[in-house]
Amino acid sequence: MTFRILGIDPGLRLTGFGVIEKTGEKLAYVASGTIKTTTGKGSEIEDLPTRLKIILDSLAEVIDNYQPQQAAIEKVFVNVNPQSTLLLGQARGAAISALVLQGLPIAEYTALQVKQSVVGHGHAAKDQVQEMVKRLLNLPGLPRPDSADALACAICHAHGGQGLGKLATAGFRVKGGRLI
């Protein structure tokens, strides 16, 4: 059975999305990108409600274009700055709203769970996540950081959040808790 998974890495300025297809234990890249709510110069577009609408509308368009059957989104972590955490939570809420409005089932994973599933340890650096996403999906180059995180979230969901043990049965070699 083949189905598509939409992974989302929520952010108020940049929201990453990634769509993969799962057929049995095999994963295939479909699409990825970044939703930007800033101008090219890093300044904010309009006000907060407008930025949230951009996230909601853009994800609705992604869903219409790629027709995923399931979605996975990264959970919010509590930042040192409470204001940043609240803003991230609002961006995440806009993303979840887009998924709910389209009737998609949603799975939520912490960044630690996603990294553990894709890289083999929960405290992996961004470049390690990018490299593993590239390898697991046979991409020609490294995906951008926000897209890589979203694709990693989708990969985590595809493997049931079970980590490298599941990957080992899919034909990848695991040694010392790491994919080789």
From Swiss-Prot:
This is Crossover junction endodeoxyribonuclease RuvC. The RuvA-RuvB-RuvC complex processes Holliday junction (HJ) DNA during genetic recombination and DNA repair. Endonuclease that resolves HJ intermediates. Cleaves cruciform DNA by making single-stranded nicks across the HJ at symmetrical positions within the homologous arms, yielding a 5'-phosphate and a 3'-hydroxyl group; requires a central core of homology in the junction. The consensus cleavage sequence is 5'-(A/T)TT(C/G)-3'. Cleavage occurs on the 3'-side of the TT dinucleotide at the point of strand exchange. Mg(2+) 1 binds at residues 9, 146. The gene is ruvC. Binds 2 Mg(2+) ion per subunit. It catalyses: Endonucleolytic cleavage at a junction such as a reciprocal single-stranded crossover between two homologous DNA duplexes (Holliday junction). Homodimer which binds Holliday junction (HJ) DNA. The HJ becomes 2-fold symmetrical on binding to RuvC with unstacked arms; it has a different conformation from HJ DNA in complex with RuvA. In the full resolvosome a probable DNA-RuvA(4)-RuvB(12)-RuvC(2) complex forms which resolves the HJ. Gene3D superfamilies: Ribonuclease H-like superfamily/Ribonuclease H. Coiled coil: none annotated. PROSITE patterns: RUVC.
